[in-house]
Amino acid sequence: MSRIGKRPIPLPAKVSVDIQGSHLSVKGPKGSLERQLPEKVIVAQEGETITVTRQDESRTARERHGLVRTLVANMVDGVAQGFERRLEIQGVGYRAQAQGNKLTLNVGYSKPVEMTMPQGIEVKVENNTQVIVSGIDKELLGNTAAKIRAVRPPEPYKGKGIRYQGEYVRRKAGKTGKK
């Protein structure tokens, strides 16, 4: 039995779950999410909790059991509280600006990099060097934050670039030169 998969998911107040066959939809104060569930995994609502069980002990059912439980738990957390990812921009002259759902990054290229956020993702900028990406879909949020970071990943010599808040960037020594 999967250690993660067998744990029940508590349902917060104001969150409703609708399960129709292999289609799951979760509604809450922040919005609603839908997901198609894989076969051989059964999701059931029992009062104020959601349980995830598997149909049989096949390899695919065992593989997906913990995954589906985590995905459903992330959906419930997302519609209840939402998720947030913070990125820091380091480097002389590097800065960001947000206008609506567009993010403009000035990170050392000849032209500013403009990114349009997908639907359901909000972006804010604090003091030109902190980008806050928020939304209810954890998977989409992580992918969006990774795309922003990929515009200028932190380099190991001076540490310039876009990094996640709290991310450790391993530094390298530069060339020592001949004397």
From Swiss-Prot:
Pfam families: Ribosomal_L6 (PF00347). One of its GO terms (molecular function) is rRNA binding. The keyword Translocase does not apply. Transmembrane segments: none annotated. PROSITE patterns: RIBOSOMAL_L6_1. InterPro entries: Ribosomal_uL6-like, Ribosomal_uL6-like_a/b-dom_sf, Ribosomal_uL6_a/b-dom, Ribosomal_uL6_bac-type, Ribosomal_uL6_CS. GO terms for biological process: cytoplasmic translation. The keyword RNA-binding applies. GO terms for cellular component: cytosolic large ribosomal subunit. It comes from the Bacteria. Keywords: Ribonucleoprotein, Ribosomal protein, RNA-binding, rRNA-binding. This protein binds to the 23S rRNA, and is important in its secondary structure. It is located near the subunit interface in the base of the L7/L12 stalk, and near the tRNA binding site of the peptidyltransferase center. Belongs to the universal ribosomal protein uL6 family. HAMAP family: Ribosomal_uL6_B. Part of the 50S ribosomal subunit. This is Large ribosomal subunit protein uL6. It comes from Synechocystis sp. (strain ATCC 27184 / PCC 6803 / Kazusa).
